[in-house]
Amino acid sequence: MELKHSISDYTEAEFLEFVKKICRAEGATEEDDNKLVREFERLTEHPDGSDLIYYPRDDREDSPEGIVKEIKEWRAANGKSGFKQG
């Protein structure tokens, strides 16, 4: 998977696949997985960072789809760019 410069370079479906890859820990090494998590934190800019993946709130669906939904809602509420259309 090609990593992109910003979250607005991803369609929602592409970003969901990125999150699924993190959740499945598909990196060749633990360091590869850690790099993906750091990239997730950079792209999302969400204050909860990787806790969105590993320690979800009780009122949120604990799935890649739930993670993406929370990011999308938080970014919209905070005036940040959304996903690329397409």
From Swiss-Prot:
Belongs to the colicins ColE2/ColE8/ColE9 and pyocins S1/S2 family. SUPFAM superfamilies: Colicin E immunity proteins. This is Colicin-E2 immunity protein. GO terms for molecular function: toxic substance binding. It comes from Escherichia coli. The keyword Nucleotide-binding does not apply. The keyword Methyltransferase does not apply. This protein is able to protect a cell, which harbors the plasmid ColE2 encoding colicin E2, against colicin E2. GO terms for biological process: bacteriocin immunity.
